[in-house]
Amino acid sequence: MKMKSLREVDAEIYSLILQEKKRETNKILMIASENYASRAVMEAQGSLFTNKYAEGYPGRRYYGGCEYADEVERLAQERAKQLFNVEHVNVQPHSGTQANMAVYFAMLQPGDTIMGMSLTHGGHLSHGSPVNFTGKLYKTVFYGVNKETGYIDMDEVRRLAQEHKPKIIITGASAYPRTIDFKAFSEIAKEVGAYLMADIAHIAGLIATSMHPSPVPYSDFITTTTHKTLRGPRGGVVMCKAQYAKAIDKTVFPGIQGGPLVHVIAAKAVAFKEALSEDFKEYQKKVIKNAKTLAEALKKKGFKLVSDGTDNHLMLVDLTNFNITGKEAEEALDKAGITVNKNTIPFDTKPPTVTSGIRIGTPSVTTRGMGEEEMEKIAEIIERVIKNISNDSVIKDMQKKVQELCKKFPIY
């Protein structure tokens, strides 16, 4: 059988890939959960390891011919352990949510109480949202941010924990721009006899390079995705203390998954190697510097930021003073060539399909090589679009400015 190229086999998919490449090349991507994977990561993910079934774990497979799959998984495990300084790693979860699921299924029973950050305050679906499996299987309690400061209300966290005695407390968020105090969460968890799980999906790259305090000394379990600030393939990882290793491993397989995606694990291993480099540390420094520069520039232009700024890779913009919705802002900015996402803000009165805010992140633009000067220009473009949201002429002018920046900073 002659192996044909994608272009020969499926012109439609080939064309869509080219169109997506054009979109990513010619627009400024500022969705905080997105990034550009390296060529090396994509080569590994597109490798012939996609052909291999490897149920089980290295040295304990249910299929023959796994000698190289074993080596790939061992490399990924050892690199992740080195990167995060943890005792045990499982690199098989297909996603961040499945990594979270592994912890829940290993340590909880249906009907147990979990406590996480409210989705509308910046949390994640898999931390107890009623539309997620967590909200259906477990009793859920939500903490949020202080209405005045925009910071996590640790007094509320302690009060709710003491009142409801959750079995597990989840820290981590999808739209929280400030440093998370893992030590304070740990103290509260110990007070009420709860496990502490840190979901670091958004800030894993920052933690790996010491740009954000690590949850490792304080947490029983740590979960993450491998994309976002880690800049790897889409996937998940569970890390834990050695005493929980067996429970986690048997929950991932055979508990909630079958065969691992060896090609994705290979790509994870590559991403971990990249993340161990000095270049990656410099990259993370620039991600934060760019975020702070952009946040300050937007504030000077009259934008209100939740918590009045950022400590990490993202900011949450409150658009209520401009009398437009997050949905309207997302659509207008995309026309100009800047891709963000509508996002609820704490105490939002609008539904999540509309929202009063937008979330903006700097990982992707920093990967392209943009710096503080470009953040000032991007702030200006955002201002012009938001203040002239119905003016097609202004939006076309801003589109030209976006194109100039994109040409100056190619991706691949």
UniProtKB/Swiss-Prot annotation:
The record marks H227 as: Plays an important role in substrate specificity. This is Serine hydroxymethyltransferase. Its EC number is 2.1.2.1. It is an enzyme of class 2 (transferase). GO terms for molecular function: glycine hydroxymethyltransferase activity; pyridoxal phosphate binding. It catalyses: (6R)-5,10-methylene-5,6,7,8-tetrahydrofolate + glycine + H2O = (6S)-5,6,7,8-tetrahydrofolate + L-serine. Catalyzes the reversible interconversion of serine and glycine with tetrahydrofolate (THF) serving as the one-carbon carrier. This reaction serves as the major source of one-carbon groups required for the biosynthesis of purines, thymidylate, methionine, and other important biomolecules. Also exhibits THF-independent aldolase activity toward beta-hydroxyamino acids, producing glycine and aldehydes, via a retro-aldol mechanism. It comes from Thermodesulfovibrio yellowstonii (strain ATCC 51303 / DSM 11347 / YP87). Keywords: Amino-acid biosynthesis, Cytoplasm, One-carbon metabolism, Pyridoxal phosphate, Transferase. SUPFAM superfamilies: PLP-dependent transferases.
